[in-house]
Curated annotation (Swiss-Prot):
Keywords: Hydrolase, Magnesium, Manganese, Metal-binding, Protein phosphatase. Belongs to the PP2C family. Mn(2+) 1 binds at D77, G78. It comes from the Eukaryota. It catalyses: O-phospho-L-seryl-[protein] + H2O = L-seryl-[protein] + phosphate; O-phospho-L-threonyl-[protein] + H2O = L-threonyl-[protein] + phosphate. Mn(2+) 2 binds at D77, D301, D347. This is Probable protein phosphatase 2C 12. Binds 2 magnesium or manganese ions per subunit. Residues 119-145 are annotated as: Disordered. SMART domains: PP2Cc. It comes from Oryza sativa subsp. japonica (Rice).
Amino acid sequence: MGICASSEQLEHVHETDESIVYVKDEQGRGGRGVESGGARKVASLFSQRGKKGPNQDSVILCQGFGMEDGVFCGVFDGHGRCGQFISKLVRDYLPFMILSHRNALLLADAAADDDDDAAFSDDAAASSSADSSGNSSPQPSASASAQMLEEWRQACASAFAAMDGELKLQPNLDCAFSGTTAVCAIKQGRDLIIANLGDSRAVLATMSDTGYLQAVQLTVDHKPSVPEEAARIKRSGGRVFGLKDEPGVMRVWLPGENSPGLAMARSLGDMRLKRHGVIPAPEVTSRRVTGADLFMVLATDGVWDVLSNEEVVSIVCATPRKQHASKAVVEAAVQRWRAKFPTSRVDDCSAVCLFLHDHTLGTAAAASAAAAAAARKARRASTATPPAS
């Protein structure tokens, strides 16, 4: 799948600043900039520009993805001079590249199954007269569900690599020191597939056995401070260290240059760092949705830098109308930025709340008091230095 974005298209993206896209089906039909009534039934999306320039965050929701009631949602946080263009291109193309790779795997599996069935039929016919007791069908090596999850895992890994390659080929897009994070969730029936790279995050709200609401982090923040990430970068010749005025924030630097100082260890784009350990490979995990799982929140680091997982979950629970949940999360993050870091510029903040059951907020309301108490405790935490940009 080749893509080509003209300079006019990129300028249009910049001028309209359409950070949110809603797609009704996998053919790409849908709307931009607003949530439709259909979107409100399953998710809430919101993005707000910070004080650092154009909004480099992008958000998408696709319904009818992979199956009739399938859902894809994603949050992308661009960085660098062309970050806003890259995050929007990835938002617009990555979901359908994942679907294309998955469909290719399905076709390959179907062809292999046809060959196996033909071979098995020939073997069975040849041996039936010699051993009538050997008629039992061969047992599958894995369940259909496990096979489906593996197909999605492979599709995500392949699509992320292909997307990174397509960015490199864009003649009107400088990806040398610009790129984007990506955190995506695919819901297929009761199965969730989460693909993540960079420092955006996915958090699940679930009820404990004792009736308390819990925030479960589903992804790892791919920062250079993570030992495994730092080791890979150093093996590839990259350098990892923090600046004197922010020693706790590890950044990635080229071998012989004090640039670019990237605050994440994985990304799409950032081509100058690809040979030095900054990889486009997502971490793909899966989870079977249970009756205790209520909703999940995908958000950029503009949210997570100032709000804890527990606070975000409690904010969603305390929102009377679920279509306003993501806006409530973003507005709370902006308020926290202003209160906690009054001399710093507020970062772009974006969130998607994906509701896993129709009764999500009604059930969660019963536990919101406990979650709110946890949030109040978190808010009393001492102030810290401003997070990395």
